[in-house]
């Protein structure tokens, strides 16, 4: 089991590359969707907001929207330095969200993440990251690894509950 955990921390998830202008446009549209539909008014100065945005973008990939960011597993779950760079440099414009909504399963994504805490997003996104890195893990093995990774920060019962909720929302775990 320990060797698998080591692999997880060394693994870097590679996404399809996208030109920077298109990626920034999509990120702006995604932020607008989050603001209009989830009341998520991104504040760059809020650590919780930055963590939430990192997890929203990562989780959206499981619902069909890949914005082209590379992720590694960090203390708060999957983290993309490229995404951080983009949101620090983002000039929010009034982008059309209709086309973006059509590119992925927005309604299921919205149901899955609406009203969720930073803790919920962190644990569920970490589970997705571990599964993506180790697709052959059974759910029990995945849960065991998740508890080892997040067990110092969160209660085992909460981790199990969030893991099962994520499965019920259609996360590919």
Functional labels for PLM-detected ranges:
Residues 2-173:
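Domain-edge interaction signal
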